[in-house]
Amino acid sequence: MSAAVQAKPQSRLLLSGNDAIARGVWEAGAKVAAAYPGTPSTEILESLSLYPDLYAEWSVNEKVAMEVAIGGSMSGARAFCAMKHVGLNVASDAFMTVTVAGVIGGLVIAVADDVGMSSSQNEQDSRFWGRFAHVPVLEPADSQEAYEMAKYAFELSEAYNTPVILRLTTRVCHVKAVVQVGEKVRHDIGGFKSDARRWVMTPANAKGLLPAQIAREGKLQALAEASPMNFLDDGSDKRIGFVTSGPAYMHVRESFPDAPVLKLGFTYPVPVALVEKLAAEVEHLVVVEETEPLMERELKAAGMQAIHGKDLLPRLGELTPNVLIPAIKTFLGEPLPPTTTYPKFDPFPRPPTMCAACPHMGVYYSLARMRKNVQISGDIGCYTLGAGHPWNALDSTISMGASMGIALGMDKARSEETKDKAVVAVIGDSTFLHMGMQGLLDIVYNRGNVTVLILDNRTTGMTGGQNHAGTGKGLNGDDTPRVDFVRLVEALGVKPERISKIDPYVLPVVFKTIKRETAIPEVSVIITDRPCVLSEFYTKIEPYKVIDDDCTGCGNCINVGCPAITVKRSESKVRPDGKVNELKFTTIDTAMCTGCHMCVESCGPNAIVLAKPARAAE
């Protein structure tokens, strides 16, 4: 069990922001917690699941996680859900309605923005949801604040009958800092009490609740002005002052230690009066916020036209000292500090790649062989890497589950150039259960000519191997019912004869199955069945090696894409017709090889054989 779970009150621990939030949620007496894994928020629920006296689950998607938390709150329990920024897009339907209905038990939503897009398809700013939904937004700058704000958010939620957004960023989620923890409070569950006028959100009922939602925002404005989470770090250099929030506060303090800084933790509603007070004391006021100029716009709308923000600073990425110092010093007309120059060396190229023996490679190896004749709509997951070398076998990746709808759109919008091309959708098991089922049903319903590949590797791989409804395991590893994908897609209307379940390691079968199904003008589903090589379900067997004298340099094994296979020698050979063949002679890292044998099946001259264990040769 982790040190955070065992820690006694007043203990000081080194915790990531995610672990600190989990401790704060537990100490606040929360009883229900739900999430769908998504970087950088994943570890919050993983950590929460270790605490006693709390129910925690992986939900099939963020909307369901939100609804589970809402149900807990309606029943009088303190409830929590977590997601990455794009997850709130999925959950927004339920979220935007519960903001009108309000809460019984405190309801806290942790939303982690991926500033800098280290693992996301966009950089949207979740603070917008506070404005949109008229709910308070809290922004921690470090792990200690993340812990404290998580606890406070439940009190705030219950006191003002509102969900509360805890806006995080990748930096807060993953950086570790010292946190002093406290005691768990007891919060009794009152139980669900039927109240149709409040919980049955018909137009008539919702109209009656809207005035309270609007009035609540004014009360929250006054609360933000007096909140101890908003404080001034005074400074002697009055030429410039800063208003900032989140981890940008740390960067501002490091960059300009002598300047006054108004640090906002309760960031919506914006405490305008506090900002006006600082503005009166400095020559120039700069709003430093990641990523969108939300506070800047609202302060200007309140009449503070002289402030600066995104006219000096970028809207993209983290606002680190390397960004702040040159921008602000140039604005002040000061010389930039001397920098130490070092010889510049280009880093060794390390493109993202799949793991050795990843079962997805067999699918993309086959798709790459028929690339000229297919349009391929991809999805979110490890298999997004199929867009890269050596496969180049994806045409689109937009959002979770989008492969289905986009593939249908491609099918219905064929041109003269594409009318004879097959349309393929590629989606993973967890993503299919998250948001792909509806898309497949739409393909069936609208008679689409799409071949759907469901890559079942029995895990949510990209975020770290979390369980889901298709693994047969829950958040804590306990046994649960496992979805049968064959029966599921048949229930969605796919004809039984158009459903294939194959082993992605058997390359001839993969190629023949895809070729057969793409030639048939109706919806078909191919389910690959091999566990992720990093999961508990995978069994490693004896590795392979290349016999140098038998290798012809054809490069077929390289095209499988396995990182255990590398080129050790290249040659150019002139053919009798004058064309030049580039030969690639390969070797296999036996320490990395798991014995999947995909490379063996790709090798025409049979130059790849089982490597003998060293002890067997003695």
Model-derived features: positions:
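Thiamine diphosphate
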Residues: 1-143, 235, 259-261, 301-527, 537-539, ...
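Flexible, low-complexity linker and terminal segments
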Residues: 2-18, 22, 28, 140-354, ...
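Short acidic, glycine/serine/threonine-rich loops at helix termini
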Residues: 44-47, 70, 91-95, 117-124, ...
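Short helix-loop-beta junction
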Residues: 47-53, 252-262, 488-495
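Short beta-alpha connecting loops at secondary-structure transitions
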Residues: 54, 112-116, 133-138, 308-313, ...
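Conserved thiamine diphosphate
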Residues: 114-163, 169, 201-207, 352, ...
